[in-house]
Swiss-Prot record:
<keyword id="KW-0237">DNA synthesis</keyword>
<dbReference type="GO" id="GO:0005524">
    <property type="term" value="F:ATP binding"/>
</dbReference>
<dbReference type="GO" id="GO:0008270">
    <property type="term" value="F:zinc ion binding"/>
</dbReference>
<dbReference type="InterPro" id="IPR020633">
    <property type="entry name" value="Thymidine_kinase_CS"/>
</dbReference>
<keyword id="KW-0479">Metal-binding</keyword>
<keyword id="KW-0862">Zinc</keyword>
<feature type="binding site">
    <location>
        <position position="145"/>
    </location>
    <ligand>
        <name>Zn(2+)</name>
    </ligand>
</feature>
<protein>
    <recommendedName>
        <fullName>Thymidine kinase</fullName>
        <ecNumber>2.7.1.21</ecNumber>
    </recommendedName>
</protein>
<feature type="region of interest" description="Disordered">
    <location>
        <begin position="182"/>
        <end position="205"/>
    </location>
</feature>
<dbReference type="GO" id="GO:0046104">
    <property type="term" value="P:thymidine metabolic process"/>
</dbReference>
<feature type="binding site">
    <location>
        <begin position="88"/>
        <end position="91"/>
    </location>
    <ligand>
        <name>ATP</name>
    </ligand>
</feature>
<keyword id="KW-0067">ATP-binding</keyword>
<feature type="binding site">
    <location>
        <position position="186"/>
    </location>
    <ligand>
        <name>Zn(2+)</name>
    </ligand>
</feature>
<dbReference type="InterPro" id="IPR027417">
    <property type="entry name" value="P-loop_NTPase"/>
</dbReference>
<dbReference type="GO" id="GO:0004797">
    <property type="term" value="F:thymidine kinase activity"/>
</dbReference>
<feature type="active site" description="Proton acceptor">
    <location>
        <position position="89"/>
    </location>
</feature>
<keyword id="KW-0418">Kinase</keyword>
Amino acid sequence: MYIMKQSGWLEVICGSMFSGKSEELIRRVRRATFAKQEVKVFKPTIDNRYSDEAVVSHNGNSLIAIPVSSPKEIFEHISEKTDVIAIDEVQFFSDDIIDVVQTLADRGYRVIVAGLDQDFRGEPFGPVPTLMAIAESVTKLQAVCTVCGSPASRTQRLINGVPASYYDPVILVGASESYEPRCRHHHEVPDKPTKNGQTNNHLAR
């Protein structure tokens, strides 16, 4: 059933890990609930770092969330009473999430999504770049580089304390023990190919 409201839009919150994306999502959701709006919060089932059924920020704040394995499952949980739809860790969804949020916004819902805009390689992550392009509002947050204290826009993956290879799997859900924020200069990706076909291992840091 197509439920039409008067106006709808898409908000994207993005940035590196530890930049406060989930915290900002939680803040916006709580403001909406204070205004007596009905909010439905969703997360991918793959994200179970802190809880299977909650959005949890790195500082411990949380919201009850509905875990879904497919973007289209979101339609099963909303109704004409729903005002706001919030989706955390959106980078873990398939590209189907793009059509889903477009449809929801077109139907008049306020849609808020949060996720990583770059993977651990420093490359665009899943559907997030497209969501940024079609959104009415984009908030890009930065963390603090753990090496030098500069603004950090990248996520460093560490395996046993060593930077992960470019050829490691892109999706590996972790928390502080496996990731940390880095600036452009201190972000390390061993084996990353350069334009001339070589790896970047020989580059001076």
